[in-house]
């Protein structure tokens, strides 16, 4: 092989029990067999690679639901060939969705003034959003760029969904704990039909018994009911809604606000502490 022929390596992360980490498996593919990228950062995949990426990232994200990179890879590997196109078509069929596709806005600390959002009146969408970011200790710059979706426009749709995820958190009030993430992902599945959001429900098995019971009885019915009843959230131009009343926007979208999960968890912890204190007192 001449020096002009380069070798491209795709690393497929397949999680296997190995302490607290996972084993990385690599397979090399000749650049001659790989089509050129369709946009900056694009990594074209063969059918085998896409399947391996889906399986590996699914296992890895199940073992560690906090691995955002694996969840992102799973989302991209399972979104094609149908689901991301359905979401793109939903945007094309909506006037606001078409504007979003034309304008290609991005959500980051460079495009949103966090200090301005903090100055907005209470209960506005912007103040609710930044309040949620502050409370959860996260920021708008944590979303990885899309790499594995071939169609450039569909890649933007996935990027837009990914960057709007925290707005979904803020408008529903769900925290970033695993219980809150699973509830929100279930809502997103009912609303967007992206397979990754549905597969995230398997993380329920990692919840504590009380949390699982709460999910089945409280969060799952809410997520299905609200996700199916609400408008397509991908078509919300969040940048234009920042000064609106959050309750008004929820009503317009048809999103029912779930029970305050943080307050529920606090109440359960207080109740457990009181029960343990009572047992300790009885044992004296």
UniProtKB/Swiss-Prot annotation:
One of its GO terms (biological process) is ubiquinone biosynthetic process. Coiled coil: none annotated. Zn(2+) binds at residues 165-166, 169, 181. Its cofactor is Zn(2+). Its main location: mitochondrion. GO terms for cellular component: extrinsic component of mitochondrial inner membrane. It is found in: Mitochondrion inner membrane. Keywords: Lyase, Membrane, Metal-binding, Mitochondrion, Mitochondrion inner membrane, Ubiquinone biosynthesis, Zinc. It catalyses: a 4-hydroxy-3-methoxy-5-(all-trans-polyprenyl)benzoate + H(+) = a 2-methoxy-6-(all-trans-polyprenyl)phenol + CO2. Lyase that catalyzes the C1-decarboxylation of 4-hydroxy-3-methoxy-5-(all-trans-polyprenyl)benzoic acid into 2-methoxy-6-(all-trans-polyprenyl)phenol during ubiquinone biosynthesis. This protein may be expected to contain an N-terminal transit peptide but none has been predicted. Belongs to the COQ4 family. This is Ubiquinone biosynthesis protein COQ4, mitochondrial. It comes from Blastomyces gilchristii (strain SLH14081) (Blastomyces dermatitidis).
């Amino acid at each position: 092989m001449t020096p002009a022929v380069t070798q491209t390596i795709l690393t497929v992360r397949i999680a296997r029990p190995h302490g607290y980490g996972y084993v990385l498996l690599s397979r090399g593919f000749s650049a001659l067999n790989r089509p050129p990228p369709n946009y900056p950062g694009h990594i074209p995949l063969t059918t085998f690679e896409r399947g391996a990426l889906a399986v590996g990232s699914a296992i890895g994200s199940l073992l560690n639901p906090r691995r955002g990179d694996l969840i992102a890879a799973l989302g991209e590997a399972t979104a094609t060939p149908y689901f991301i196109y359905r979401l793109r078509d939903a945007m094309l069929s909506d006037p606001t969705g078409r504007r979003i596709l034309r304008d290609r806005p991005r959500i980051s600390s460079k495009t949103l003034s966090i200090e301005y959002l903090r100055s907005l009146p209470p209960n506005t969408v912007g103040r609710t959003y930044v309040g949620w970011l502050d409370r959860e200790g996260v920021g708008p710059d944590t979303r990885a760029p899309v790499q594995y979706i071939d169609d450039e426009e569909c890649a933007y749709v996935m990027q837009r969904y990914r960057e709007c995820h925290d707005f979904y958190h803020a408008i529903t009030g769900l925290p970033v704990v695993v219980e809150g993430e699973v509830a929100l992902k279930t809502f997103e599945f009912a609303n967007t039909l992206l397979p990754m959001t549905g597969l995230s429900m398997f993380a329920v098995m990692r919840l504590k018994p009380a949390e699982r019971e709460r999910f089945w009885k409280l969060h799952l019915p809410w997520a299905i009911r609200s996700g199916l009843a609400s408008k397509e959230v991908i078509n919300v131009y969040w940048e234009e809604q920042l000064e609106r009343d959050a309750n008004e926007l929820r009503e317009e979208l048809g999103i029912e606000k779930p029970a305050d999960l943080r307050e529920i968890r606090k109440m359960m912890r207080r109740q457990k502490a009181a029960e343990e204190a009572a047992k300790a007192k009885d044992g004296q």
